[in-house]
Design a protein with these regions (language model features):
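N-terminal ligand-binding/catalytic initiation module
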Residues: 1-235, 240-242, 435-585, 592-593, ...
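Structural alpha-beta junctions
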Residues: 151-156, 269, 336-339, 392-399, ...
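General beta-strand structural signal in soluble alpha/beta enzymes
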Residues: 157-162, 180, 251, 274-275, ...
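Catalytic or ion-translocation cores adjacent to nucleophile or general acid/base/metal-coordination motifs
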Residues: 207-231, 235, 241, 245-248, ...
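Short, charged/polar "capping" segments at the starts of alpha-helices
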Residues: 281-283, 410, 546
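Core active-site phosphate/anionic-ligand binding loop and the adjoining beta-turn-alpha structural block
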Residues: 299-519
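Intrinsically disordered, low-complexity regulatory segments
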Residues: 657, 661-669
């Protein structure tokens, strides 16, 4: 429904209206979340409805109680579809949002982007990506949060408990405008079924990473990381044989995050073949031109792959079907696959993150809700077949890596032949081999920004500024980080040509602390000078140097025994909050799954002021060097180099450096 800006502002200021809107018709054309596992007892179902009714006037309780009970029965959750706005949710210009605080308006823009139909995976269920990465639990929370943000000042802070707006509280100008927590659980109650139960009760949510922290920028965010990963994987195997052919990269997933893989394959210059079982996801990526070609028949796909490889094409091909069928056919036909991975949502294996082979998409969705134990058994059977086919191709020279989606972990739990020994997997995580030692240890990670004007010309200006900064930095950069800077310089120069924007006018760029600070300073000056027309919002993925403690992904290249600890992520969000972040977040889960990860992020609004300049220098320096310090203490060579360099540059930084012990001393014990 199209409305004027003034009508939009009025809608936001209403919050939860006293006269409730009509219940909308269920829209089958939208990609919906599957029905969630039925896990609540009869008394717990009543508690879930009681909890939901807290948002509403008692005069509406009788009919809403029946409606919410039916929603819970039909979908496994209470989404409050009745309150879903009729206006289009999108990253409008910052001035279109009603506000007393420009910082709060920027947050409204960012959370709106996460719910844009062009961006979100299941927009009507408030899921941005990953099958269960939620912005809010229900539409009442959305409406109330937007109302609070429109009313608050720079002397207040909004507190969000797993999507629930607890309230706005007195604070001060240097405090965050919003503090977000998602899925914070007593450690003993952080198993997957605990998420199912407590989310169904309406008391917690899984925010993934940038979903619940309002920092998702569409698949562009993961395109860059995937491009870097694939490029470096190609470099790792390049010397093994000098073939006059394209490299073949095979993987799965065309969802919110995994949908980046085909675009990244083309940018990296290889043949990318991506399997996806959900036809709506395939259609979305094909219509966005993130996939070049689509096949449903393996008999047609295999010859096309051979031709693309032989012709040295850089092309992305989607296989609409189950990834295991594809792997088994490639293995049976003895096709040489150079690089393999997986981006199914195995952090969420029993609720739509992974589909069993030999069972249709529709049958699987029905089974996961009605026969969850049988569904789990079928998934684990499929994982065993999946790994067997991968092993056969790996024996033939394929380099396979886990893309941080819990593939190795869930395969091991399924009893697949995935272990090298009792403690180690056969295959590395991409962080162990590539992202950790080449990027995170040196402080390089997914820095990003959004132009709050929503004008493409402002984004063009930021691209130009960032390129100029990197061109200067690379001249004097030490050899250890020249390649990282050059890769990102190439990326930013080609970003517009690669047509990466989906949703907000955003850009991602892997940079270290020095690069982030210099780029942010230059943006702030350009805003002050009127070269950029409106504030710029800085952020990053939680998947970064310091933001995430995740033993099977971000911290998988930590070998001092501390990879199962979470001090780094907690220290990071606390440190960001008092160094100038506009909003901060800390989440349970993200990437590998609920109970497996602790991760956090931030947002920072640059408005051209001296205050912004002061905050960005303090916060961005900490936000990167916290993680380098931890990685250095774990004896990671690149991190020791990076933190010593940081101390040389800033005399106020003093970090404890590890003393390295001679192996012979320990061997003689």
């Amino acid at each position: 429904m199209s409305i004027t800006v003034e009508e939009f502002k009025k809608e936001i200021s209403l919050g939860i209206p006293s006269e409730l809107p009509e219940l909308p018709q269920y829209d089958e054309s939208v990609n919906h979340a599957p029905k969630r596992k039925e896990i609540l007892s009869d008394s717990e179902k009543k508690l879930a409805v009681r909890n939901a009714l807290r948002y509403f006037d008692p005069k509406d309780h009788k009919f809403l109680a029946k409606e919410f009970s039916e929603e819970l029965e039909k979908y496994g959750r209470i989404y409050m579809y009745r309150l879903m706005p009729r206006y289009k949710i999108t990253a409008r210009s910052i001035e279109d949002f009603p506000h007393k605080s420009k910082q709060a308006a920027a947050i409204m823009l960012m959370l709106s982007n996460n719910l844009d139909h062009a961006v979100a995976q299941h927009p009507h269920e408030l899921i941005t990506y990953g099958g269960n990465g939620a912005v809010f639990q229900n539409w009442a929370q959305y409406r109330l949060t937007m109302k609070y943000l429109s009313e608050m000042t720079d002397e207040q802070t909004l507190v969000l408990y797993s999507g629930h707006p607890m309230g706005i509280y007195p604070s001060h100008k240097d405090a965050p405008r919003v503090v977000v927590t998602n899925g914070m659980m007593i450690p003993n109650y952080s198993k997957p079924d605990d998420w199912e139960r407590f989310n169904a009760l309406g008391v917690t949510q899984y925010g993934q990473m940038t979903a619940g922290s309002f920092m998702y920028i569409g698949p562009q965010g993961i395109v860059h990381g995937t491009t870097i990963t694939v490029m470096n994987a190609i470099r790792m195997i390049q010397n093994s044989e000098n073939e006059n052919r394209s490299k073949l990269f095979v993987t799965s997933g065309l969802g919110g995050m995994s949908g980046a893989q085909p675009k990244a394959s083309v940018i990296a210059g290889c043949v990318g073949v991506v399997a996806e079982i959900n036809p709506k996801a395939v259609k979305t990526r094909y219509s966005q031109k993130w996939v070049d070609e689509v096949f449903e028949d393996l008999d047609l796909l295999i010859p096309r792959i051979k031709k693309a490889v032989e012709n040295k094409e850089a092309v992305s091909i989607a296989y609409q079907g189950n990834i295991v069928d594809l792997w088994e056919r490639l293995a049976a036909d003895n096709i040489k696959v150079d690089i393999g991975s997986d981006q199914t949502s195995l952090h969420n294996p029993w609720a739509g993150g992974y589909y069993p082979v030999g069972i249709s998409f529709e049958e699987s969705q029905k089974m996961m809700a009605e026969e969850p134990e049988r569904f789990k058994e079928e998934v684990q059977k499929t994982l065993r077949r999946h790994v067997a086919a991968v092993n056969k191709l790996a024996d033939n020279g394929m380099y396979f890596f886990d893309y941080g989606n819990a593939f190795l972990l869930e395969s091991s739990r399924a009893g697949a032949d995935i272990m090298k020994n009792e403690k180690e997997f056969k295959y590395p995580s991409y962080v162990q081999d590539i992202m950790g030692p080449m990027c995170f240890d040196y402080g390089f990670g997914p820095f990003r920004w959004v132009c709050s004007s929503s004008r493409p010309e402002d984004l063009d200006k930021t691209d130009s500024i960032a390129a100029e900064i990197l061109e200067e930095m690379v001249k004097d950069a030490p050899s250890e980080i020249k390649q990282q800077i050059n890769d990102n310089l190439k990326w930013i120069k080609e970003a517009k040509k690669n047509n990466l924007v989906v949703g907000s006018q955003a850009r991602i760029l892997y940079a270290d602390a020095e690069g982030r600070i210099k780029i942010a300073e230059a943006f702030n000056k350009a805003i002050k000078d009127g070269e950029i027309s409106a504030p710029v919002i800085l952020g990053r993925d939680h998947h970064d140097v310091s933001g995430t403690d995740s033993p099977y992904r971000e911290t998988s290249n930590i070998y001092d025994g501390s990879r199962f600890t979470a001090d780094m992520a907690i220290q990071n969000v606390i440190g960001d909050s008092f160094r100038g972040a506009t909003w901060v977040s800390i989440h349970n889960g993200g990437g590998v799954g609920w109970g497996e990860v602790m991760n956090g992020g931030f947002g920072m609004v640059l408005d051209g002021s001296d205050d912004s300049d002061r905050r960005l220098k303090s916060m961005l320096f900490w936000d990167v060097n916290n993680g380098i310090s931890r990685r250095s203490w774990a004896r990671n060579e690149g991190a020791i180099f990076a933190i010593k360099r940081a101390m040389d540059a800033n005399p106020n930084l003093k970090v404890t450096i590890p003393n390295l012990v001679d192996d012979e001393i320990l061997n003689n014990l």
